[in-house]
Amino acid sequence: MHIILDNGHGLNTPGKRSPDGTLIEAIYTRQLVKDLALELEKHSHTVHILVPEPEDIPLNVRVKRINAICRAKGVENTVLISIHLNAAGDGTKWMNATGWSCYTCKGQTESDLLADCLYKAAIKHFPVGIAIGIVCSDAPVWEVFYCSFIEAVCK
């Protein structure tokens, strides 16, 4: 299995940080992607880090990179996971945000199966009520139209 990991926004993306600037999405998600890549490789998956650069890369460039990998490795063998941080409030003060979410393409797709696995794993590995938030077995999978989802050929 080829897994493309997209690490969200870049260092130069306005607003993608905590109110006091101590938590910067680009730094945090890039570390998450590196850690996840190591774990996936331990399980014999081939990992492609979509954006190794520190700066933000436009969506159309990301889509071209995604499609190149999908064409080379096979659409049926490739999964895209884009990691972002969610926020609460208007960015001017710290809030007490918790939890996480999973977004998939509109309609019933193979990405829904992965989302279901993520929710089940969260329930198994994270006790209800800890700082990461509360997850339940009927947690919603958010379906959206994102440029990278619409124009990418991978699943």
Feature map (PLM): residue ranges:
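Glycine- and acidic-residue-enriched helix-capping/strand-helix junction motifs
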Residues: 15-31
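Active-site-proximal helix/loop segments of hydrolytic enzymes
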Residues: 2, 27-155
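A short small-residue
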Residues: 11-18, 99-101
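Acidic side chains
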Residues: 6, 13-15, 112
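Boundary/activation segment at the start of structured domains
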Residues: 1-9, 21
